[in-house]
Amino acid sequence: LRIEDTDKARSTPEAIDAILRDLAWLGIDWDDAPLYQSQRAARHAEIAHELVERGRAYFCYCTPEELEAMKDEAKARGEQPRYNRMWRDRDPATAPAGAKPVIRIKAPLDGETTIADAVQGNVTVQNSQLDDMILLRSDESPTYMLAVVVDDHDMGVTHVVRGDDHLNNAFRQKLIFDAMGWNVPVFGHVPLIHGEDGAKLSKRHGAQGAQEFRDMGILPEALDNYLLRLGWSHGDDEIFTKEQAARWFDINDINAGPSRLDFKKLEHVNAHHMKLADDTRLADETLALRGGNVDATHRARLIGGMHDLKARATTLVGLAADASLYLKDAPFDYDEKAAATLNDHDAHHAMHAIYDALARLGADFRDTEIESALRKIADAQYGGKLGKVMMPFRAALAGTMTSPPIAKAAEVLGQSETMNRLKAALHWMHDQGHSHH
């Protein structure tokens, strides 16, 4: 891991911490301590001077005014503004006294350079397109181009995979590798991700940083899976683990055309990974997202109910909303639909029957027993219409009409809390004016 922190304004401690935190969250580990580019300026400068000694780079003493004049002349001729190499073959002894030079590389003047890119295929540029770029500024600080190449070499980097907006840089970096006689890494320039409208991904498309996806309730393994599928595939496999990905992935299979970020598809992949995820882990992620302290009883309830909860949710945010079924205690408020269901004479009648039947279940408080008790009431009093019993039961237990399978939820809540919720519903109905005949 290398932190390219030479831009002091952007590389605040907070920004660097965010990178380390996001990588850790995504499960992307690294060997050795991170290398900080800014701490290696002396090493970078040493290589720039070595290139001068090898005759592959030179001191340039041009003043800012001279460079400005060159730009204007080139523009007047309708050419690209670039340095005219006036110091390339000049004797540094003729330099103005006290002038501080920059070091520039000697780019080849003719011929062409080809890079065998792992994603783009062979890419060739005319060397006349390459300029004698600056390697070391007059204050002895290295440019990004030099720093990157020296660091790649010293770290033993074998593959450089990055956005295709860096393709031009690869040719300039290859100049430095070649001039030092170093191995050039394999380059793979991957297309940039576009938004759903086909434009380059930007803030207006929504989430971009790992933290934003995390806040949306996306699991890291789902984000990894989804991002890997953007522009790369393995047959018809949509959902896979990191272990499978590591076995299957080949950089040469990446599409050279841009992919579109599809948030619906991401949620679909996330829903799958939630079903695969460990229930205890999901419960703890959910609790962390909700904040606040939760005691062991409520946590145990949430873990017990997680299998059914996660089957319905697409994100942790949705899961956190549904989790209140297990995290609250009676009495609690009923939403509009639940209140309408309970505020009914038949429902009041059913609720008493449910209460009496479940109170008799004793120790064997299981979903199958609960369901058969409710079915008996429906058969005896409502001509087998199960909804007449299940709907008020769901309203009383969940406080809302959408919930996981409710008999199983009752088993997870346990007899004591289930009875408390039924009692609270009966009190609420009584206050609405439904007396029991």
What is each stretch, according to the model?
Residues 1-79, 168-182, 222:
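N-terminal Rossmann-like or analogous alpha/beta NTP/dinucleotide-binding catalytic cores
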Residues 39-43, 192-197:
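Short, conserved secondary-structure transition motifs
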Residues 19, 51, 55, 105, ...:
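Residue-level signal for inorganic ion chemistry
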Residues 246-274, 311-315, 384, 394-400:
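Core structural elements
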Residues 365-429, 433:
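Charged substrate- and nucleic-acid-binding regions of tRNA-handling and nucleotidyl-transfer enzymes
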Residues 136-137, 155-166, 194-226, 230-238, ...:
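Conserved phosphate-binding loops in nucleotide/dinucleotide-binding enzymes
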